[in-house]
């Protein structure tokens, strides 16, 4: 959908889906330093494609993110349910909800990981096209929620991780609330482990 203002009115830009497939959820857009925009998405699968300047079409189609099936890229294999096939199969730690950023020439992809319940993990790469290297855990499984989708930003020289949990009254897996924690990157550029705080920020 497109609009001239964040408050709308919104309208369907192309009259149909940009991409269709099983697990095609949780999209995120990353705009690189050269102005090129990329769309990432996926659940039990991970895809990406460069967008045209109109931001509503792919330049050269889309494909699976290189290394998605490689434990070195997205964490050790574990048995997960493939809902499309109706049976378990061995998959990497990546589960869903990719979020891509860039810092000091390094690309960071954080994502919900490990199946259900999810924790937040991440991988890094020297290029938007990979190769990706699994770097471990950023946050533990969310409180009172079986999912934990997140994304970090830098604002006025400070770093913040936004995520969701089920801590509000009557909250649970399908009644989630947004939360945010401030953090500082480690000296080597890696994410620190970010604990939950009751007060958040």
Each predicted region: which residue ranges?
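Carbohydrate-active catalytic/glycan-binding domains of CAZyme proteins
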Residues: 1-201
């Amino acid at each position: 959908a497109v609009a001239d203002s964040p408050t709308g009115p919104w309208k369907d830009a192309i009259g149909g889906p940009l991409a269709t497939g099983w697990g095609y959820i949780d999209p995120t857009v990353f705009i690189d330093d050269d102005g090129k925009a990329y769309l990432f998405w996926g659940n039990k699968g991970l895809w990406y494609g460069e967008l045209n300047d109109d931001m509503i079409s792919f330049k050269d189609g889309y494909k699976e993110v290189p290394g998605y099936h490689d434990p070195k890229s997205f964490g050790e294999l574990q048995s997960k349910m493939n809902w499309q096939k109706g049976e378990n199969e061995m998959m990497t730690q990546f589960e869903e909800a990719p979020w891509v950023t860039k810092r000091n020439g390094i690309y960071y992809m954080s994502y919900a990981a490990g199946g259900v319940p999810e924790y937040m993990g991440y991988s890094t790469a020297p290029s938007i096209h990979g190769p990706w290297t699994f770097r471990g855990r950023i946050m533990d499984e969310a409180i009172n929620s079986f999912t934990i989708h997140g994304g970090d930003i830098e604002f006025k020289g400070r770093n913040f991780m936004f995520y969701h949990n089920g801590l509000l009254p009557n909250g649970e897996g399908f009644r989630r609330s947004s939360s945010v924690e401030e953090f500082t990157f480690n000296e080597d550029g890696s994410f620190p482990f970010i604990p939950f705080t009751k007060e958040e920020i």
